[in-house]
């Protein structure tokens, strides 16, 4: 990995720079994503686009902006440096696993999550399907070499994911029009917040540009900090560099980019609207796979090492376990504790895998 201007700095100063870059990057991603979504929603409303479509597209995709910025940035970096995209793939898999185990776990511990029957019949089976498809793409159809890695999301596979994303958006809009009583309440509440911020069109356009620039900067900063920390840790402890990068992507970066979902779910729990938590997680995980992996893989095929097999399987197992809880109609506190224990066990495994 090329670190350019910090190469000649003292090690301790490099470490501080990487940590600060990572923190500032995550803060920028969270804050500027909010600005981007609010301004984009305002522009859409000024253009008389139905609020339902705004909620199911602009707002939904906006929640995946942090993951997209990080993964695309790492995808470009891997293209320029002929290296693996460990952070890009680790970010998506780690974020989805974090959403399922940490976010839902915390939410259920606060207040048991009530699950609508329609979720188990429509949205969640779709999440199971796209999760399984992504695992198949990475594990069964990946290609590799000594340079690019053992497993990959190829460009054709990424394009398929993007196409499926548009199919999913069409399905959401079609289903919402067919069953208006089942509109996504959480998206409507988010739109209600943007209504209160009645801004002029030119202001909204400027804020969209500012938000997009902030998201790009945040993504670059996160990747710079994450890769720098991974390089330092792997060099200092004589660890496998790919494993160190994967560890950072699956933990620090994944949790950081999942902060919007975590905050939204905890706030919903405190307001007694905990049933929104599962819907937020399902939507976020679907968009992470189809939108983030799809776009990043289209920019440049995403390659990584064989460790991705276990990580992808853990994500799939977490998806199935949560579905099992959801089928009972409620994720109880005991279920939430179980999810948190699973996440703690997975983090322990990641650390042990990296240092062994």
Segments from the language model and where they lie:
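Hydrophobic alpha-helical segments, chiefly the membrane-spanning helices
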Residues: 1-356
